[in-house]
Amino acid sequence: MVKLPSLTPYWPLIRFLVPLGITNIAIDFGEQALNRGIAAVKEDAIEMLASYGLAYSLMKFFTGPMSDFKNVGLVFVNSKRDRMKAVLCMVVAGIIAAVFHTLIAYSDLGYYIINKLHHVDESVGGKTRKAFLYLAAVPFMDAMAWTHAGILLKHKYSFLVGCASISDVIAQVVFVAILLHSHLECREPLLIPILSLYIGALVRCTTLCLGYYKNIHDKIPESSGPEIGGDATIKKMLSFWWPLALILATQRISRPIVNLFVSRDLGGSTAATEAVAILTATYPVGHMPYGWLTEIRAVYPAFDKSNPGSKLANSSNPVSKTHIKNXTFACMALSLTLCFVMFWTPNVSEKILVDIIGVDFAFAELCVIPLRIFSFFPVPVTVRAHLTGWLMTLKKTFVLAPSSILRIIVLISSLIVLPYLGVHGATLGVGSLLAGFVGESTMVAIASLYVYRKQKKKSETENAVEGEDSAMTDLPHNEELTDIVEIKEDGE
């Protein structure tokens, strides 16, 4: 009789990952709800969707790096003093982001970035800059939320983090429904998704901060003891954070770059506006079945026994590295299955777009091919997430920086080359994104192999030194040998 392996060690992983996965999917649902708030507007729905999509993707460029401060909270924050340093970093970053939002909205720089580079008309450009100004405070609220989310994850409160994100989405959906029946639909329809986004962000931030104060604040020391390396410095936090922030910034800037090249490829025509609208609609739907795989990178820092912080948070940890690898593979298989069921089963993807976002069926049919390309994203995303988590545990994130550069190079190369092969519109955008993901994951794998070999070589050297020390310890000292000789002589 074949004995099945015990599933007991996998339950902590499941309890940890499921709320995070739901969180990621909930964020995508929130984006779809916001898009529905635009699509439901009777007049100029495609133009409004394109304007909001451009502004939102640019805003995500600023919020992206801040969301990676979650990992700083997960790895570094062991005391109240560490938390204050992390919060201070995010306050400064939020202020800088708000200044950039204002500059882009009011200066010639914004006119050049949005109108000239994207080749959009005055109407779309004006609405995009206005929406971008309205979104100026979102990066700051996002930063506060993610910092406390990381601290909660360190102490295994992933359920609370998931609840906060679901509450965010529920608030967005409710307020979109309410505002669609207000005078805003006629006077300023752009404010419908933007105000709903603010309400949701406020709910999430408040939930996470209250959760921190209720469950963790009184339990952690004022400062970190020497057994976990003492207090983390701002320099250490930023050194750990900047490669992750660079990677996420390049991921988030990828969408604006894609919008830019797709729009320019079609010459700023009506077809270009339609293509950007298709990308705006397909991003959250395509991202939903695989986006949660990114959360796998939080598993290693939370569960690996070599991480001193995780030892404090979970002393009786039954999860081994093999369990983490097996669970990662299972997550990838599940994501691939979801992608192919949702995007390759006839009429399923169209129904999602029509029922959830509220677009018409003809527009939904134009989204089918881009969505099918999203089916291949789970493989590179899983590889990247798993290896990034391992490198975070070792605090070797600096080796990840080249992967972000390669991603942008591959992305732009694809956006330039593919039109010569007859690929245009939203298909060009999503196909180039896939190429960028593959390039980035390949570089992460190479960086991980480099670190692994260095770690192995270092371990072998240490073992050799310990072996020599042990051999020397086993031999009697010179004084002991002399005593033995003297005893023998007396005996004779």
Curated annotation (Swiss-Prot):
GO biological process: phosphate ion transmembrane transport; regulation of bone mineralization
GO-annotated cellular components: plasma membrane
Membrane side Cytoplasmic: residue ranges: 1-85, 153-158, 211-327, 382-403, 453-492
Residues on Extracellular side: 107-131, 180-189, 349-360, 427-429
Record key words, sorted: Membrane, Phosphate transport, Transmembrane, Transmembrane helix, Transport
Membrane topology label: Multi-pass membrane protein
Residue intervals passing through the bilayer: 86-106, 132-152, 159-179, 190-210, 328-348, 361-381, 404-426, 430-452
Keyword set includes Methyltransferase: no
Keyword Transmembrane: yes
Compartments where located: Membrane
One Gene Ontology MF term: inorganic diphosphate transmembrane transporter activity
Described function: Regulates intra- and extracellular levels of inorganic pyrophosphate (PPi), probably functioning as PPi transporter.
Family label: Belongs to the ANKH family.
Alphabetized PANTHER family for the sequence: PROGRESSIVE ANKYLOSIS PROTEIN HOMOLOG (PTHR28384:SF1)
Name listed for the protein in its UniProt record: Progressive ankylosis protein homolog
Species, as recorded: Xenopus laevis (African clawed frog)
Gene transcribed to yield this protein: ankh
